[in-house]
Structure formats: structure tokens, C-alpha cells
Amino acid sequence: MNSFDKTSDFIDQVIHRLYEKNRHDRIFSKDAAHSSTTSSVLFLLGMHCQETDFSNLPCLILNKRSLKVKQPGDLCCPGGSISSRVDAFLSKLLYLPGSPLTRWPYWQLWHKQRRTEARDLALLFATCLREGFEEMCLNPLGLKFLGPLPQQQLIMFQKVIYPMVCWINRQKRFSPNWEVEKVVYIPFQDLLNPSLYARYRLNIKTSKDNENHPDIRDYPCFIQHSKHSTEILWGATFRITMVFLEIVFGFTPPDIKSLPVLSGSLDENYLTGNG
């Protein structure tokens, strides 16, 4: 992170690396805009590490899911499924001058040379902007769009996630709704530290049938320590984060077989949100 002493250098590096990654690849599947399995999320970056001592370094900003939703306690990016009518209307507003999308340096190129994908990009970006506002009162006009990340497939749910990388310019306070327990800030300085990764060994108790035959699975994870709590980043959000770190910094986490074991469990409430 020492090579990014200036915020502008960090942002420019992210924009450039994402564009180079995406310039020759198709980002969205052909039915992405119409599939019920499609979700889009905001991969939020900013300088607001309020719970750490690294307030002047770039951070990843995530939501911690509340006990009232599926996957309670997990760290996630704000976002969700497409609301056809609402998001179609909002996507048209993103074509207006001064929007986060039209301020993106490569928008005009996409709009001219990749028109279908540009339309899908606008729709999916509108979706996660709306969800970000609903979940944490994120100001969509205060974001700088840096580019899309490759899609991710959820393992336990039939969902395809399209992450949109954004920089939060000025907003420092958020107001989470009932879906969100709190906002979590992870400095990239920590994410680039191999010693903070572990092997998350989960005992998955999704029914009484497997009590005598436990379903034990290992997942790579990142452990975030703060003054008030310890958070575990794993699953789809972990994979999205690792893709970002590899594209932008050339960083890959240690092999899972070499990592210390951290034990945990999931019960049937994990899939229903009835905790």
C-alpha cells in the first residue's frame, strides 16, 4: 500500500487494472438482465475506517447481515436482485451527464462499442445503487464508479452476483436498515497481510438428519480484528474480494492447506433467517 500514498493514485490504479481485465472479456451473461438468479452488488471502497487506526488508508466497506435475513452474521456487499420496472427507469437516469456512470472514463467507449453490455451495466448498476440506498442510506450521487468485476456464483443459493466497484467520495456516516446489523471497515493494508487468513472449518447443521453424520467443510477466510469485535470474511464476498486483490495488487492468499483452522457452525436458520 506504500505505493498509493495519494488517494487519486489508488483510484486511478483500480480503474486502469479493472479496465485491462475487462477490455477483451464479456462481463455479463446474455440473459443477465432478465434472469431471476441475477444479483448485483456494490464493492465499496473508501477512506472511512472508523473502527481502526488506519483512517487515512483505503478500506473495503461491507455490511454485516442482521439476524432477520438469510445468512445472518455474514459480511456482504450491499446489493440484491433486479426490480424490473424501478431499475429499468433508474438505469435511464444513469445515462444523464454527471451521473456516476457517465463520469466513468470508459463509459463512452462502452456505449459505442459494447452497447448491449453497456445497457446491462446501467441496469445492474442501478440495481445495486438502489439497494445501497435502501440498506445503508448510501448516497448514489456521492460515488465514483471504478468498473465491474467478474461475476461470482453463490454456492448455497442459485444466484449469480455481478459486483460493481465504487469509491465513496465524502459520505462518512451510514444509516443501516433492518437487514444490516452494522457497517464494517477493513483496511486494504490488512487484506494484503497473509497472516490474517485462516481455514474456516464449518459444521453445517441444516437438518436433524445430519446430526449423527455431520457435514464438515473447509473454506478460506479472512479474520478482521477491531477494538470491539472480530469479523470473518468468507464465502462469495471473500471470493469477490480475492478477485479484486489479484487484479489490482497481484495478491493471492496463502494455500488453504497451510492455514490455521478456525472452527464454526451453521444451523438451519442460516438458510432461512429465522434466528
Language-model segments: what does each one mean?
Residues 1-180, 188-275:
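N-terminal leader/linker segments that precede catalytic domains of diphosphate-processing enzymes
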Residues 183:
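Amphipathic alpha-helical interface segments
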